[in-house]
UniProtKB/Swiss-Prot annotation:
The gene is tmem192. InterPro entries: TMEM192 (IPR029399). It comes from Danio rerio (Zebrafish). GO terms for cellular component: late endosome; lysosomal membrane. Keywords: Endosome, Lysosome, Membrane, Transmembrane, Transmembrane helix. This is Transmembrane protein 192. It is found in: Lysosome membrane; Late endosome. Its main location: membrane.
């Protein structure tokens, strides 16, 4: 019994020694602790504005220019025959209908590029933790591309039977084409204005990430919900989507914090 207790004691002592040595050999534990002020200054994130206003401005300008050009070409070169020679010289012999349709295709490409740029900027906002703003503008930021895609389908529907339409009413297809183009402009401008209002409010408010805002509201309110994402009237799909976004954001945020803590610790050890 004495020998067994001695072995047990020796084994326990060896375990303690090994644990102490492994702890002492760890440079992160043996090194100086990171001060709270240094850590907060290092992990503090400055708010970065969502700069999509230039894309909205470019799209709006090009869209207005296209509609004006279409109206001028349609009135002077398509409906009227008085300026046929001038139109032929100005368009280098290209048919006015072809110019309008090629311009529509080019405008759709511009709208598609705009949609990709805005989607990329909003994905960056989502990764930074502004999940409510991302979901609030998720639909409206994609409406211009949807409007122009539907407009293209409507234009094809009018152009294909244009001879039949013009046989019943003179230049009916031209008037319908202009109506579709002008309606596209009206709906697109409305969507862009609403989207711009949301972006301007977001940039002026300069909010913290949603996790930080909910922690503050929970700390100030005694009857706050204890689980992130649950609100009165929220559907299960919205709750699951928000919690999934929060998990992705927190994973990325934790990895960033870990790298910064290691960097600060290494700097203090070298100092």
């Amino acid at each position: 019994m004495v020998m067994e207790s001695g072995r047990t004691s020796a084994y326990g002592n060896n375990t303690n020694v090994d644990f102490t040595q492994s702890t002492d050999d760890d440079p992160l534990i043996d090194g100086p602790l990171v001060s709270q002020d240094a850590l907060e200054s290092a992990i503090k994130r400055e708010f970065q504005t969502l700069s999509t206003h230039w894309a909205v401005g470019v799209l709006s300008f090009l869209h207005v220019v296209y509609v004006v050009v279409c109206i001028v070409i349609t009135v002077f070169c398509w409906i009227s025959d008085e300026h046929t020679s001038e139109c032929t010289a100005a368009l280098n012999g290209i048919d006015s209908k072809t110019v309008v349709l090629l311009g529509k295709v080019a405008l759709w490409v511009v709208v598609f590029i705009y949609d990709r740029v805005v989607q990329r900027r909003h994905s960056a906002v989502r990764r930074k933790g502004y999940l409510d703003f991302y979901r609030m503008t998720k639909g409206i930021k994609s409406l211009p591309l949807l409007i122009h895609s539907a407009g293209n389908a409507a234009i094809l529907t009018v152009i294909a039977p244009s001879s039949l339409l013009d046989a019943n009413v003179k230049n009916l297809s031209v008037y319908l084409l202009l109506a579709i183009i002008c309606l596209e402009l009206l709906l697109t401008i409305i969507c862009l204005l609403r989207y711009t209002v949301h972006v301007v409010k977001f940039n002026r408010k300069k909010p913290h990430p949603d996790v930080t805002e909910e922690e503050r509201s929970y700390g100030c309110s005694s009857d706050a919900h204890t689980e992130t994402g649950f609100r009165d009237g929220s559907s299960l799909e919205d709750v699951v989507e928000k919690q999934a976004d929060l998990i992705d954001y927190l994973k990325q945020h934790n990895s960033v914090l870990s790298r910064r803590i290691l960097t600060l610790t290494g700097q203090q050890i070298r100092a």
